[in-house]
């Protein structure tokens, strides 16, 4: 749980931008814990009555509270019978203020009823302010924006398309603006990745035990576990990317027997998944490029040469007619449908970024995103390069809390070394199967993997290991395929 009612500091409000708290006698206040609402970087000054009793003296310097939907500490260390809290900004949203004595016990002001929204949920202050009770890492952007979609507020995080945050907003609508509320949808998408990976591997290998093995690898992968338990959009786009490649595999497998109504339905579903991936995060565009290469490669191999057409008993003119009809379906499924989904995702922003014109809103946001990702270059202790991800050179620290028991609570994003390091030789073996053994499944996985990794070679913004998430899912499929090839398909073992 987390505080829900908000007290607004407003300079034109009846209370103004200040709060005067009174106590029954003098009390020693060690610190104040402030659960900040949806506006970051709020500035406060605490003060106490001066010795003459005719004014106020500030306690220390102005304090900046950085993190939204998070408990922010304010050091006080003063004995007083009154405490003034002044907001230095035009407005500030505070969901709860908890004053603590030197032993960590809460102190409730005698006039708390004057500011009911700030002191009505004292019981929600946890003994240890870990990630279970507050936002962490990019949740301060994505969860906040999901809540802004729910409440129709001005959208803050506009550096990614809206759909991922819209999905997160569904959890907030049901469970409120709490850690569970903004994380539950991500957990659901993480869970759904397991049956999709099972079905994908089952289709590739036609083996139940190998499909189960691949699904278990995803279950026990640390990055999948972490991203499924935090409120960011990465597991959502990861799910749609995995689904996009799976559905394209089904499409190509079906096209071997010609284009049927079943094939058309699969193409439409494939286009919907691709559109959802793009509308969640731009990394979905890489997957769209990947399935385009896979589709064109398949069509060239099947119809691009006279020998291929002869094998199918098809003349050149018949092949042209067939491909022309297929092209119309592909344009509808892989261009129009994704475009509609992408543009429609901006309806969740309402009129906030435009003048009621969803196309204008979408276009302006594309320019903003492009500018942001071009300019986002900064030093970060957990940043890493694309060639460092596979061997987990630098994990990402999401949250760190020192507990009162002397222990620490840490959330970190990185892969399971057993799985990821095993996937490195599996990658090279898959390339061998593709190039030397002419294995088409291996080729499909290699092209899928390359489409998700190669764009990062040309991106010079600051990046982190979680950008490798989609690649790691494909590498797990490579592990399963290598195992299948080694044990069940290699004629040398029969």
Functional labels for PLM-detected ranges:
Residues 101-146, 319, 329, 338-391:
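Aromatic-rich transmembrane-lumenal/periplasmic boundary elements in polytopic membrane proteins
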Residues 205, 244-266, 277, 296-306, ...:
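Membrane-interface transmembrane helices that cradle and orient dolichyl/undecaprenyl
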Residues 182, 223-236, 280-283:
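Short acidic/glycine- and proline-prone juxtamembrane loop motifs at membrane-interface regions
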